[in-house]
């Protein structure tokens, strides 16, 4: 066992997570069509503060993330402060770590708490796949800059004459890695082939995710942590996530064609997480501050770890790399965990990480560790379903997972929970949570 790194303040306070909330998650271009991420962020933070009845001046910092950023609101965190009635003097800044963005936001607030610069803060994230920053070609962008500096009409017309029709076509946000040109689905296909993961295994995991998420909703387990969203023109509220296929069968999954490697692939739209809109946030405090305010925490942040690997081959192995570090820093093993929640970007990616967590060879030859991190107990794993079912608003997923895991730990009488995710750029994140 390596060095244990307790997450406590200088006064010995633990980092308490006192509350968490999210919007329902909606598939791209459905319920939240036309609602930008900044408005989703305002929606969830405003409701979170209203529900907890925490005075606005108590919150000293807000760290928020957005992966698909809009040029008109580059600092989403500050816009949320200004748009929710929070104290205008509240420090606010934005972060981005791809699919692990709200993990990073939580870590940043926790570090401020440990440093003693604040005693309470909010962390979270929001993304919209329905309101996108549609850009222009590089050639058109350059011409427009030059036109702005041109002094005469003839100079402007000469510049415009250089353009061709293709230069005027809109440019949507990139879906591929900047450094490799590979799409996330291409990497998932790599991983399926590398680790021998079949189409049937991927479809089975996706089906399990939807079935468990549907059951969680039907049993009322998510009602406290998901707000009702009222959306213009306010004819019908969104109460639940609208991506969950509770009535699907395995035969339905088998009908879909591969989405990336059309000829030999196994990754489909059904065994991948969909493009999604939504927001999520959590309130963190020092343990003593929560007691002063009479608040009973959902739980505590025990440890966290971030990792990075190469992006050319199987780059979505973040959980396999970050989990052993987070467990080590928490002074725990896989066997000590009550729950394990892993982000399901793709079924192939999820199954590959599960395989490697239990691999002695991977631990020895790749991580340089004496023993495997540990086998994943299916009865503890994604017990309420995962991102394939709920959807994945990139910057919101981590806060969803943290809140969901803490609520479930409390229902089970407490214990330790692991939340972990892969992210674009070969990044990984893992956090160990504790509930009493």
UniProtKB/Swiss-Prot annotation:
Compartment(s) of residence: Cytoplasm
EC numbers on record: 2.3.1.16
Annotated GO MF terms: acetyl-CoA C-acyltransferase activity
A Pfam family this chain is assigned to: Thiolase_C
Keywords in alphabetical order: Acyltransferase, Cytoplasm, Fatty acid metabolism, Lipid degradation, Lipid metabolism, Transferase
GO biological process: fatty acid beta-oxidation
InterPro entries reported for this sequence: Ac-CoA_C-AcTrfase_FadI (IPR012806), Thiolase (IPR002155), Thiolase-like (IPR016039), Thiolase_acyl_enz_int_AS (IPR020615), Thiolase_AS (IPR020610), Thiolase_C (IPR020617), Thiolase_CS (IPR020613), Thiolase_N (IPR020616)
GO cellular component labels: cytosol
Major subcellular location class: cytoplasm
Reactions catalysed: an acyl-CoA + acetyl-CoA = a 3-oxoacyl-CoA + CoA
Family per record: Belongs to the thiolase-like superfamily. Thiolase family.
Function as written in the Swiss-Prot or TrEMBL entry: Catalyzes the final step of fatty acid oxidation in which acetyl-CoA is released and the CoA ester of a fatty acid two carbons shorter is formed.
Subunit structure: Heterotetramer of two alpha chains (FadJ) and two beta chains (FadI).
Name of the protein in its database record: 3-ketoacyl-CoA thiolase
């Amino acid at each position: 066992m390596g060095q244990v790194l307790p997450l406590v303040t200088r006064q010995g306070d633990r980092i308490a997570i006192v509350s968490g909330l999210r919007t329902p998650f909606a598939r791209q271009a459905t319920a939240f069509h036309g609602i930008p991420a900044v408005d989703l962020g305002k929606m969830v933070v405003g409701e979170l503060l209203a529900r907890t009845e925490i005075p606005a001046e108590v919150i000293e910092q807000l760290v928020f993330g957005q992966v698909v950023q809009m040029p008109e609101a580059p600092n989403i965190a500050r816009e949320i402060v200004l748009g929710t009635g929070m104290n205008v003097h509240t420090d606010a800044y934005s972060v981005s770590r791809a699919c692990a963005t709200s993990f990073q936001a939580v870590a940043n607030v926790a570090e401020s708490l440990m440093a003693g610069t604040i005693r309470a803060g909010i962390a979270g994230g929001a993304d919209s796949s329905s309101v996108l920053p549609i850009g222009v070609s590089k050639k058109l962008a350059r011409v427009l800059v030059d036109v702005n500096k041109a002094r005469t009409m003839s100079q402007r017309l000469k510049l415009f004459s250089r353009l061709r029709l293709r230069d005027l076509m809109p440019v949507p946000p990139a879906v591929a890695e900047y450094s490799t040109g590979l799409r996330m689905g291409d990497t998932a296909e790599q991983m399926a082939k590398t680790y021998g993961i079949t189409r049937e295994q991927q479809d089975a995991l996706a089906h399990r995710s939807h079935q468990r998420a549907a059951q969680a909703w039907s049993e009322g387990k998510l009602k406290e942590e998901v707000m009702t969203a009222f959306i213009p023109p306010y004819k019908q509220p969104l109460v639940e996530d609208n991506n969950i296929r509770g009535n699907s069968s395995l035969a339905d999954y088998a009908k879909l064609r591969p989405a990336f490697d059309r000829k030999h692939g196994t990754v489909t739209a059904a065994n991948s997480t969909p493009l999604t809109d939504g927001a999520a946030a959590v309130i963190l405090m020092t343990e003593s501050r929560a007691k002063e305010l009479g608040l009973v925490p959902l739980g505590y942040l025990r440890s966290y770890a971030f990792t990075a690997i190469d992006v050319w081959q199987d780059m979505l192995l973040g959980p396999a790399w970050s989990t052993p570090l987070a467990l080590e820093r928490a002074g725990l093993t896989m066997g000590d965990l009550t729950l394990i929640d892993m982000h399901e970007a793709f079924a192939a990616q999820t199954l590959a990480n599960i395989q490697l967590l239990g691999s002695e060879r991977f631990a020895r030859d790749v991580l340089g560790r004496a023993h495997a991190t540990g086998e994943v107990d299916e009865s503890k794993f994604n017990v309420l379903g995962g991102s394939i079912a709920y959807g994945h608003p990139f910057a919101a997923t981590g806060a969803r997972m943290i809140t969901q895991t803490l609520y479930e730990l409390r229902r089970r009488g407490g214990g330790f929970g692991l939340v972990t995710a892969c992210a674009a750029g070969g990044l990984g994140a893992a956090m160990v949570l504790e509930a009493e």
